[in-house]
């Protein structure tokens, strides 16, 4: 995926699209496996909905951290300790 400061080119966008397609295929296989194991579709839909909400919140948080980092003249990762964030999350 494109990182801060990385130049956006058609090649990097195509690479990101391919990675996302591969991730979608992997997730579709996992869903099929869970259904085969007896999980109900409604449970999976609720779980997926919660994951989307989590990812949206995380995306907004990263954007805000980025803006704060620019304001303070530091990198985003340098802000992680200030907010007790794990850099591996």
UniProtKB/Swiss-Prot annotation:
Metal-binding as UniProt keyword: no
Subcellular location: Nucleus
Gene3D superfamilies, sorted: 1.20.5.170
Keywords: Coiled coil, DNA damage, DNA repair, Nucleus
InterPro entries: DNA-repair_Swi5
GO CC, alphabetical: nucleus; Swi5-Sfr1 complex
Top-rank taxon: Eukaryota
Pfam families: Swi5 (PF07061)
Record GO biological process: cellular response to ionizing radiation; double-strand break repair via homologous recombination
Secretion signal, residue range per the UniProt entry: none
Coiled-coil positions: 7-37
Similarity comment: Belongs to the SWI5/SAE3 family.
Function: Component of the SWI5-SFR1 complex, a complex required for double-strand break repair via homologous recombination.
Subunit annotation: Component of the SWI5-SFR1 complex. Interacts with RAD51.
Name the UniProt record assigns to this protein: DNA repair protein SWI5 homolog
Species whose genome carries this gene: Rattus norvegicus
């Amino acid at each position: 995926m494109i990182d801060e400061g990385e130049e956006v080119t058609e090649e990097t966008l195509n690479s990101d699209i391919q990675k996302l397609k591969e991730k979608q295929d992997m997730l579709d296989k996992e869903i099929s496996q869970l259904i085969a194991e007896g999980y109900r579709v409604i449970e999976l839909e609720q779980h997926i909905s919660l994951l989307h909400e989590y990812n949206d919140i995380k995306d907004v948080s990263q954007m805000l951290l980025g803006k704060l980092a620019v304001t303070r003249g530091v990198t985003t990762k340098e802000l992680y300790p200030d907010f007790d964030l794990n850099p591996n999350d």
